Regions:
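Conserved helicase motor core of SF1/SF2 NTP-dependent helicases
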Residues: 1-134, 138-206
């Protein structure tokens, strides 16, 4: 699960008991780019116990992560729809809008519908992901991968400095193969604040 296991030594002790067992750590990340992985690692490094297990990307460079500030959630929805259209024109087929909670996903979906469009919403009841453009809550995103990911709301009111939010942000940031956009309005989450460019320009690469 997205919560994860805190101490694998307990698993080895109580599950495998006296049987011979060995713990191996898979550190290499083959999904995402150096630029994306380096930013995600800065988030997960806030959990001291996970620092030794931070992902090491294969040497595949790509675009820098884009941090985009908007005045409201409605403005975020509008900009994301434009980015989706542009990404598809550029040939990207699998695109995900990741919201923190299911309620936020539904709010996003409702605003999209008011604009005369629909996007598939992943609820966890699906047997498989068939591709295309989807909206997915952060806690269901683990194990999935997409060409492009847009984190819809990385505001401080959504992501605080606690272990659960750190893990959810990390999972969300490590889903894309090629391109990552992170949106927020109001105050940016402290998890990313040290990465924000002082220029404050829309679409700041960081």
């Amino acid at each position: 699960s997205y919560r994860g296991i805190k101490d694998w030594s307990d698993v080895m002790q109580y599950v495998f008991d006296d049987r011979k067992s060995q713990m191996l750590t898979l550190e290499q990340s083959y999904r995402t780019t150096v630029e994306i992985m380096s930013k995600a690692n800065r988030v997960i490094s806030r959990i001291d116990a996970l620092r030794p297990f931070m992902g090491k990307p294969v040497i595949r460079h790509g675009e820098k992560v884009r941090l985009i500030e908007k005045k409201s959630f409605k403005d975020i929805v509008s900009d994301i729809l434009e980015k989706i259209d542009k990404s598809r024109e550029e040939g990207y087929q699998s695109i995900a809008v990741i919201c923190k909670t299911m309620d936020e996903c539904k709010a996003f979906s409702d605003l999209v519908r008011k604009r005369g469009r629909t996007l598939d919403l992943i609820t966890g009841k699906e047997k498989e992901y068939k591709g295309g453009v989807v909206i997915v809550p952060s806690y269901l995103a683990k194990g999935l991968e997409f060409d492009v990911v847009m984190i819809a709301n990385a505001s401080s009111m959504r992501y605080e400095v606690n272990e659960l939010d750190i893990k959810l942000m990390y999972v969300s940031m490590t889903r894309p193969l090629h391109r990552l956009y992170i949106y927020y309005y109001g105050e940016l989450t402290p998890l990313l604040r040290d990465s924000k460019d002082s220029s404050g320009q829309e679409g700041t690469a960081f």
